[in-house]
């Protein structure tokens, strides 16, 4: 996986939206999805068309400060969702997702081995930003609806659209 990964299941009072994009540095999208699923079982899910993203990164990092997700071809007119992150979770640290050399998914450690690791958030931010990041987030639509859910992202390699010129650079100050 290279480029940007962005995934956001969001729950509102009468529907949920599932948004997902994998985009390469050159703008190619091997994967994209945007669908609204209604709470009312008599309503069919709605395809929202090609989703568009506008992320603002924290200068010097690969961390998303805020986002705007747009669905220009939504059935009822353009749908815009403002994403306000509430909490970062660096899921690639301490979970077996790949940043821990001594503990990976499926790695045999011996019979009945149990390990633990406790770190403060400020200790892992500097390297955790290079893995997968989940944010608890508030989502607000241009129709006034407020919901909550997950905003997940990762940037691997360059992603020049947001000022990431190589695999390790952070976003420039704006």
What is each PLM-predicted segment?
Residues 1-174:
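Structured soluble/peripheral alpha/beta segments that form catalytic or ligand/cofactor-binding pockets
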């Amino acid at each position: 996986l290279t480029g940007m990964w962005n995934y956001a299941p969001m729950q509102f009072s009468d529907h949920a939206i599932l948004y997902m994009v994998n985009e390469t540095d050159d703008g190619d999208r091997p994967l994209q999805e945007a669908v609204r699923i209604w709470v009312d079982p008599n309503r069919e899910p709605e395809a929202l068309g090609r989703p568009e993203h506008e992320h603002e990164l924290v200068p010097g990092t690969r961390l998303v400060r805020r986002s705007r997700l747009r669905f220009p071809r939504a059935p009822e007119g353009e749908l815009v969702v403002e994403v306000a992150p509430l909490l970062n979770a660096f899921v690639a640290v301490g979970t077996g997702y790949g940043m821990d050399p001594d503990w990976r998914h499926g790695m045999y450690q011996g019979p009945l081995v149990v390990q633990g690791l406790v770190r403060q958030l400020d200790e892992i931010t500097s390297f955790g930003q290079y893995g997968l990041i989940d944010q608890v987030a508030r989502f607000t639509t241009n129709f006034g609806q407020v919901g909550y859910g997950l905003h997940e992202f990762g940037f691997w390699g360059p992603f020049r659209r947001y000022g990431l010129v190589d695999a390790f650079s952070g976003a420039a100050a704006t």
